[in-house]
């Protein structure tokens, strides 16, 4: 079996897949290296012989996690690296190494699935969009704050905005004008994300008409799903690209 890791700025997403058919056996999201080791150590009847990961953390943080995994589970993790080209996709950044690896693998994975022009929107701590044409050329993309960043900035810099996560969840049940602070903030931020997503569609249509695929991924994908009815919601899109970047025999 294979342990796959997507090490983001805030969380580590993990899953264990079968080596022969890539079926997902187990998975989850944790907030720290220690929590990851605890979860993996407590899995019943599950062992893995290989590990591959993508990380947007610092080199030191990534090396520390690789060392912990090697010492604890006797595996040799393979790490995704920046590339100018992968699986038919050409990196569109002027300095290809500066493109976030999670973004890179997400749209490489999307192009692999679609084999056509595609728009990829990832809604996590940050929100990103990327455009890949039918020939695999990455045309660039956009980055803006995601729901957690927008919410936390308002809570941090506006003294009278205070509410908990339970209130936040309830507030998103509807998108009518808010009659309480939590409703106003959560719904306002949600509408901003939806507006961002719709603008990406307009840009993609300017390139390709309606001849393109739309992929949405990330923890907050559900917030825009209803305004993108033709989109494919693929929570593990980064892992699709990771398998292409780090094939294991």
Swiss-Prot record:
Manner of cofactor binding, per the entry note: A monovalent cation. Ammonium or potassium.
SUPFAM superfamilies attached to this UniProt entry: Actin-like ATPase domain (SSF53067)
Chain positions recorded as ATP binding sites: 6-13, 125
Pathway: Cofactor biosynthesis; coenzyme A biosynthesis; CoA from (R)-pantothenate: step 1/5
Binding of substrate, residues: 93, 100-103, 181
Gene Ontology molecular functions: ATP binding; metal ion binding; pantothenate kinase activity
Binding residue positions for K(+): 122
Keywords, comma-separated and alphabetical: ATP-binding, Coenzyme A biosynthesis, Cytoplasm, Kinase, Metal-binding, Nucleotide-binding, Potassium, Transferase
EC class: transferase
HAMAP family given in the database record: Pantothen_kinase_3 (MF_01274)
Protein family according to the UniProt entry: Belongs to the type III pantothenate kinase family.
Function summary: Catalyzes the phosphorylation of pantothenate (Pan), the first step in CoA biosynthesis.
Protein name in UniProt: Type III pantothenate kinase
Species whose genome carries this gene: Pseudomonas savastanoi pv. phaseolicola (strain 1448A / Race 6)
Taxonomic path: Bacteria, Pseudomonadati, Pseudomonadota, Gammaproteobacteria, Pseudomonadales
Protein encoded by which gene: coaX
């Amino acid at each position: 079996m294979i342990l796959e890791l997507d090490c983001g700025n805030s969380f580590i997403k993990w899953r264990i897949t079968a080596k022969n058919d890539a079926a997902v056996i187990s998975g989850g999201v944790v907030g720290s290296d220690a929590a990851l080791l605890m979860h993996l150590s407590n899995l019943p009847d599950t062992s893995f012989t290989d590990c591959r990961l993508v990380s947007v953390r610092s080199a030191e943080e990534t090396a520390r996690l690789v060392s912990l995994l090697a010492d604890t589970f006797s595996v040799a993790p393979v790490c995704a690296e920046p590339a100018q080209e992968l699986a038919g996709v050409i990196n569109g950044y002027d300095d290809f190494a500066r493109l976030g690896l999670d973004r890179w693998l997400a749209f490489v994975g999307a192009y692999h699935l679609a084999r056509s022009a595609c728009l990829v929107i990832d809604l996590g701590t940050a929100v990103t969009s990327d455009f890949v044409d039918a020939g695999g050329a990455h045309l660039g993309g956009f980055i803006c704050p995601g729901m957690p960043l927008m919410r936390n900035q308002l809570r941090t810099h506006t003294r009278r905005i205070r509410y908990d996560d339970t209130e936040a969840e309830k507030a998103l049940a509807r998108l009518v004008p808010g009659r309480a602070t939590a409703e106003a903030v959560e719904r306002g931020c949600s509408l901003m994300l939806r507006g961002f997503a719709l603008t990406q569609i307009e840009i993609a249509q300017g390139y390709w008409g309606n001849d393109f695929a739309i992929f949405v991924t990330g923890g907050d994908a559900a917030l825009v799903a209803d305004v993108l009815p033709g989109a494919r919601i693929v929570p593990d899109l980064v892992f699709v690209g990771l398998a292409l970047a780090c094939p294991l025999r």
